[in-house]
Amino acid sequence: MRIPDYLIPRCPHCGAPLSMNLRADSTFVEDKGWHAAASRYDDFLRRHKNLKVLFWELGTGYNTPGIIKYPFWQMTAAWPDAFYACINLEQAEIPLEIQNKSIGISKDAREVIENLLTGV
């Protein structure tokens, strides 16, 4: 499958193809806005540590597992009322340590969410 050139977003200044902001190389943007969002996320985690929390992972792979996957596993193991749900077509893996408070669904995330919304 080939994507037509006109569908590829381009930089408005130089015309270069844009890329996703992934922590994969030196192009990752970690600016003031990123740090503000990280601070809000840390605050959310701090305020909800002793409450019922669902760590819901949608299609997260192993490109940068230290950002989402591993912290979710660690918090699920450490927090008494945390539950981990992983929906991933190919990698719905659950560590042995948290299997009793987790669910892994090996299906397309869109299909699962549509089923949840329609009560199927």
List where the protein language model places each region:
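Conserved catalytic alpha/beta core of Sir2/sirtuin-type deacylases, generalized to analogous enzyme cores
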Residues: 1-120
